[in-house]
Amino acid sequence: MKRLIQFQFMLVLLLVCGQATIQAKRISQWQAQQQAYSFWGKQMPMKAKAKSRVVSTASLSTLGNDSYYVFNNDAGGFVIIAGDDAVAPVLGYTSTGAFDANNLPEGLKDLLKSYEQQIAALGKNYKANTTSTRAEFTGEKLLNTAKWNQGAPFNKYTPNNYVTGCVATAGAIVMKHHGYPAKGVGSHSYTWNGQNLTASFEHDYDWANMPVRYTGDNDAAFDGVARLMSDLGIAVNMQYANGGSASALEDLVTALKKYFGYSKYARHLKIEDLGAEAWNGRLRAEIDANRPVLYAASDANVGGHSFVIDGYKDESFSVNWGWGGYCDGFYRVGALNPEVDGTPQGDQYNSSQAAVFALQPSDGKEVLSNL
């Protein structure tokens, strides 16, 4: 099993800045490194004197330039610097560990890819009118959800011990937060790989005895968690596979309502349904209402990935990737879709982002959502 590293990480959305209009302007690796040193000096002075070494870049093949640079700090941590001065210089950072491009959560890879595409758009004579502005969000609230994963011991009851699937893991994390239901209703069956998979949900879920973190030596304590993830996998017709198990977030919403007593008013929405600005406000409202948000981001080439948003800090959101705490931290999850009077001014590369709103236990009571 991969060694899990806890990251305190903040990834900042690409913010177009300037006056009425802007033009993209590339920055060199040397300039980016100076910005990295400046960042450490302001945010983490204890790391300012350590060397920052470039370890990764994302190249824009159509332009022959780099969309961002990643610098590892010899004292621990790394910072991601934009390769264009039309966006916020610091795209993300962590105070611990090191950047490893070969060992990142798939959802994070998708977000990084979308940022790369957005900077590419800036390089193609892109202009954005930014005369319409709003006050920045401020404040902080964290719900601190369980640091669960998809492999052992969580996959104890899956066919061939295949990984549980990101949808099942994300759903289990949200259910653990609510500690609901005490017992499910009904059962579900489907055919997978020629086998009939079936589960009855009419058994107790012992939430109080489900640990929030796997430490490597408490496998037995996770039996109930493994059963929960198996139940969710069957409830959503999980397509189990050795390389990854897949299902749709929409199917999870249906299952939570049908078998586990969650609100019938819960809704699955795409970011374009609300617009980027309203989207971020709605996410904050969910956290304020004590509702961790099931979230999905997709890549057209490799499919989608589901995870949990469980807090916010100013303009960023706390993301639980469902990787046992690995790479969890603060991210900007909205889109760089500049608008003038409600009209998008450029390509929209984050249209595959989706979330579930108003998801909460019904408890026999239903509160109508305003969505």
Roles of regions detected by a PLM:
Residues 1-27, 234-237, 241, 256:
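Bacterial Sec-dependent N-terminal signal peptides
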Residues 26-64, 73, 79, 85-146, ...:
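Cys-His-centered catalytic/binding microenvironment captured across papain-like cysteine peptidases
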Residues 32, 162, 167-174, 248, ...:
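Stable alpha-helical elements in mature extracytoplasmic
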Residues 48, 180-190, 264-272:
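Surface-exposed patches in mature extracellular/periplasmic domains of secreted proteins
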Residues 58-75, 254, 258-320:
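Active-site-adjacent substructure of cysteine-protease-like catalytic cores
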Residues 78-82, 230-234, 238, 246-257:
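C-terminal, surface-exposed recognition/capping segments
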Residues 87-245:
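Active-site-adjacent structural segments surrounding the nucleophilic cysteine of cysteine proteases
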Residues 170, 181, 224, 238-252, ...:
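Extracellular hydrolytic enzyme modules, especially secreted metalloproteases
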